[in-house]
Amino acid sequence: MGESDLRIDPLTGAHVIVTPWRQHRPNLPDGHCPFCPGGLEAPEPYDVRFFPNRWPGLPTGRAEVVLHSPQHDASFSSMDPDAAARVVELWSARTAALGARPDVDYVFVFENKGRLIGATIDHPHSQILGFGLVPPIPGTELAQPTCDLCRNPDDELIVTRHSKWLATVPWAPSWPYETLIAPRDHVADLPTAGPASRHGLAVILAECIVRLDALFGPGTPYMLWIHQRPTDGDEWPTAHLHLHLAPVMRSPGAVRHLSSAELGAGMLFNSVDPSQAAAELRKLGEGA
């Protein structure tokens, strides 16, 4: 199953979904925040909420927005554990609902936080896409003969542990201070993780964002995305649920930009040693 607007570059094999309708979306909302209670997308009071994206990256109801909190200035780092867990629970519920559709083979949860990332609305929210195929990067991970996430990571790359979850800096991170959060058990996706495990994910995610805010300042801009088992009905035995948390800063006050050499050659350059990044993030949690 594919995407009707998907094009594959004949030179590189890059996947591009053409979405001309998104050119008409507003850069910034006019007047009141549409995500605050009483706003355009949230006419009634709520704790967490989802709705179809008005300017979807994918058509036919396969693009959703998830509101994390009714508070306009809330964040994972400021929420109490139960509030953060409600967001993860909604991610899980929507993964199951979208994944049950015959036209969805992969459910992709992500968050772009901050204007530096391109977020046009400050209110805390994430998005979910239901792809009609398995995207290339998750597909590459899933094609590995064994599950790398089931191996014990180097101690020097560990940032923190919580319950059944482990947060590490990847051995070859694409972004300085990127963190990978994964369950210690081989769990395939959010729905099968179970409520207690999903609560643990919310706690360790919030803790990792607190560390980023301590390093870069409050409201650190970041990208977040989740890789999990496809929903196409195949077994996918190597699927191991995990979350990437990538701040776009390389140091306080300095943004990490992708260069033409990186985009053109497909070779990334990371100016921060992964073990040093892990040590800094680890130290920021001491005594917390």
Describe the residue ranges of each PLM region.
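Extended C-terminal subregions enriched in glycine
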Residues: A202-G217
